[in-house]
A protein has these predicted regions:
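Detector for outer-membrane/organellar transmembrane beta-barrel domains
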Residues: 129-131, 140-227
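Outer membrane beta-barrel
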Residues: 1-118, 125-148, 152-157, 161-163, ...
């Protein structure tokens, strides 16, 4: 909802189905659930001199697949190698700055978020000091710009796109299964993703998308992060 030319609010909810989603933290009270209804997004965006400040619960800077949301992926299944920390459905609580140039030719985002908690980790929370999760994403479009923070994996021939992006997340003591030196480590995750879509002469579209992911847990086992 646009309440002012420089202020926007977003509030979305989701309803649990009958599947067992405990592992995805949909049924935990700390995820904001009220009976079968939980808060999916709740954020305010303030536009200040060309910068957008986001505050609340939303998708942190991460890979294109996560920022696509459930309806703009090229395939039905979400990538199993995507293991960035999240409360539920890729979301986290925090604040972020977003900036784009040339209508989306180049854009970047950086934010600090709650990160690893008992709500996003079935084990004992390794980050007992409650350090921030730092998240950033940088995108360059070689062909037509892609405006806005959220992404899509196809424009269905509306424009030619060649986009390359780098995403990075880090949290002190954000990995592990406990709070001792033997069970606790820093979490570092990053990925490179690209999207190429080109209109062809017969009216069709060539589309190619890919990504590479890397995660480091300080050599501390943490199966809730590495899938």
């Amino acid at each position: 909802t646009q309440v002012h030319k420089n202020i926007l609010f977003e509030f979305n909810t989701e309803v649990n189905n009958t599947n067992d989603r405990v592992a995805d933290n949909y049924t935990q009270a700390t995820s904001g659930q009220f009976h079968n209804l939980f808060v999916l997004d709740a954020r305010a965006t303030f536009s200040i001199k060309g910068f957008d400040l986001w505050v609340g619960k939303f998708l942190p800077p991460s890979d294109r697949s996560n920022l696509n949301g459930p309806y703009f992926l090229n395939v039905y299944n979400f990538p199993v190698v995507q293991a960035y920390p999240a409360i539920a459905a890729g979301r986290d609580h925090g604040a972020m700055v977003f900036k784009e140039y040339g209508g989306g030719k180049f854009k970047w985002s950086y934010g600090i978020f709650e990160g690893r908690t008992n709500a996003s980790n079935a084990d004992a929370n390794p980050d007992e000091n409650d350090n921030f999760l730092h998240a950033a994403r940088f995108t360059y479009n070689f062909w037509t710009p892609e405006p806005g923070y959220y992404t899509t994996s196809s424009y269905y021939g509306a424009k030619d796109v060649l986009a390359l992006a780098f995403a990075f997340q880090y949290e002190d003591d954000g990995a592990g299964t406990g709070t001792t030196a033997a069970t606790q480590g820093d979490f570092t995750g990053w990925n490179i993703d690209f999207l190429m879509e080109k209109k062809i002469s017969n009216g069709g579209v060539d589309n190619l998308e890919g990504a590479y992911y890397d995660y480091d847990t300080d050599d501390i086992p943490d199966t809730s992060l590495i899938q």
